[in-house]
Amino acid sequence: MLMADPGQLVSVSHMSLDPLSSAMVEEAGAYPINRGGAEQVYLMHPDLVLAGTYTARASVDLLRRLGVDVVEVPPADRLQDVAAQMRLIGAALGHPERGEAMARDFEAQLAALPTPDQAIDAAMYYPNGYTAGAGTL
């Protein structure tokens, strides 16, 4: 939503309306939602679909067979991976300069954070969350 031109987005994931999953709940409310099913998404006539690599394979494959351009965005396993996602999404939306600017800003803010003197162990628990482990953010 931050990188798209006005009118460029047709729909957003239902997860974007969940305050436990999205930092842009209010903005997402301005768009029709989808649940990621190929039939529902196809009927919205998109020319591009941004999908996570964990999106149902059948949906991604069917959309591609129907001629829809699908760009898969891998999950961020580390904070450093977020900048790569920004660049990928910016390029996919036809705004690589926006993706690059956002990624550089993110990297600068990340670099400005203090580095702890030693590793810190932490555990996270929250409703509807995911289990954290090796190789996760």
Feature-to-residue mapping (PLM):
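Extracytoplasmic substrate-binding proteins
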Residues: 58-133
